[in-house]
Amino acid sequence: MFKRKSTAELAAQMAKLNGNKGFSSEDKGEWKLKLDNAGNGQAVIRFLPSKNDEQAPFAILVNHGFKKNGKWYIETCSSTHGDYDSCPVCQYISKNDLYNTDNKEYSLVKRKTSYWANILVVKDPAAPENEGKVFKYRFGKKIWDKINAMIAVDVEMGETPVDVTCPWEGANFVLKVKQVSGFSNYDESKFLNQSAIPNIDDESFQKELFEQMVDLSEMTSKDKFKSFEELNTKFGQVMGTAVMGGAAATAAKKADKVADDLDAFNVDDFNTKTEDDFMSSSSGSSSSADDTDLDDLLNDL
């Protein structure tokens, strides 16, 4: 059941999450704000505490999601756990120093962070059937910063930290989305004054909410992440020979050249040659050397 927690404890958990710095597939248990035709929408939600007292009430997932060469790469990133070596995309970014050398490529493949929480939907004008129910909610850095701003305050200046997830002393969150220059803008979203969730002292009501919640720590469990080998294979399929190194890249380029030469072969010219002409030209050392080089490169892979 729910327990009162100190804001200092939550602040420590939030700091740990911020140090870990996603993408998740469509989830039926996920709540999404419905927007009107103009791209605007609003609702009132309440962030809930963790289902596990030892865990933070939020989860952070890092992912790479992009399309290249007509193929998609959408995978969670091991940097979710602070491990940058087990992600082929992170290695590609680092090896090629994309941040400094290729801003366009970097923007395409860079890490993307998503934040998750259990929420109680207080008011949802566009979908009133959701009101009073608990969902998982995915949100971005703008809202994450607003949550942190309620916790990481300047106590010396008389500010009081608020654990917005506390069922008794937390605060409802007014989620407002407006379209600005073609993008969803969350600037007008804000926390209201501290208040208890209505009827929260009723243990049966607490149990009802608690049973609808999910253990967010399962989302970031390491056994949910694919191996480097599996990710590297997928990354290579999407990126093509651009990410291949050494003999593999050379062999791929050689194979591409052979294919181009075959495509450019003049069939009409071939039909005009005699058998002697053809046999003579095909016995040349250059072609034979190219074939041998290609075979050697492929055998070395």
Curated annotation (Swiss-Prot):
Residues 3-7 are annotated as: LAST. Keywords: DNA damage, DNA repair, DNA replication, DNA-binding, Metal-binding, Repressor, Viral DNA replication, Zinc. Residues 272-301 are annotated as: Disordered. GO terms for biological process: bidirectional double-stranded viral DNA replication; DNA recombination; DNA repair; DNA replication. One of its GO terms (molecular function) is single-stranded DNA binding. Residues 279-289 have a biased composition (Low complexity). The acidic C-terminus is involved in modulating the ssDNA binding properties. The N-terminus LAST motif is involved in the cooperative binding of the protein to ssDNA. It comes from Enterobacteria phage T4. Zn(2+) binds at H64, C77, C87, C90. Homodimer in the absence of DNA, monomer when binding DNA. Interacts with the DNA helicase assembly protein; a ternary complex between the helicase assembly protein, the single-stranded DNA-binding protein and ssDNA is an obligatory intermediate in the helicase loading mechanism. Part of the replicase complex that includes the DNA polymerase, the polymerase clamp, the clamp loader complex, the single-stranded DNA binding protein, the primase, the DnaB-like SF4 replicative helicase and the helicase assembly factor. Interacts (via C-terminus) with the viral SF1 dDA helicase. Single-stranded DNA-binding protein that participates in viral DNA replication, recombination, and repair. Coats the lagging-strand ssDNA as the replication fork advances. Stimulates the activities of viral DNA polymerase and DnaB-like SF4 replicative helicase, probably via its interaction with the helicase assembly factor. Stimulates the unwinding activity of UvsW helicase, inhibits it DNA winding activity. Residues 290-301 have a biased composition (Acidic residues). It comes from the Viruses. The keyword Lipid metabolism does not apply. This is Single-stranded DNA-binding protein.
